[in-house]
Amino acid sequence: MIGVVVTGDAKFGMDIEAVERALGRVLVMPKGKSKAQVRKMECSYASVSDLPGVDLRFENGRFMYVSVDKPTVTTRSGFKVGDPERMVIDRLKTDSTYERYDDRYDETKMHITVGKIKVVGTGATQKIQGGYLIQFISKQDRVILIEAGEAAFVSLSEREGDCNY
């Protein structure tokens, strides 16, 4: 199941207020930004008031992605930051969408992804146009980051073209 428990009833694509209602928690906008400003920004992050290490990404005011870098929450399957990579592999390797690969920029990191994506184009024009992924990034055989959301945003985890809050 794709998602992390922190998202509760929040669904990707919801606006900021709907996410807050679904979570039953207050979102903290970037310093100096109001909810109204974030709704109009091409890209921005918000954090969850009482959950350190949880960041939500909004694109044009819509929830697209969640990132967790502390063991404050778990996935719906029970995984959390700090878990052994082997545990994730053993539980997910039979999923038909399972992939494990090296980080392009840091040879000490590994990525494990599951989920469905839609890719259009070929070669240099190929791009992700839909679907949802959950990704586990590990270093030294421990999960250090969990990301979930619309596939195009999860695939940005190596920070190509990432937004500036």
For the regions a protein language model found, what residue spans apply to each?
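N-terminal low-complexity, Pro/Thr/Ser-rich intrinsically disordered segments
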Residues: 1-14, 165
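Acidic/histidine-rich, surface-exposed loop or edge segments in extracytoplasmic proteins
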Residues: 1-7, 62-73
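Solvent-exposed, acidic/flexible segments
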Residues: 8-16, 77-85
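A cross-family detector of function-defining hotspots
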Residues: 14-59, 85-158, 164-165
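A short, polar/proline- and glycine-enriched secondary-structure boundary/capping micro-motif
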Residues: 74-79, 155-161
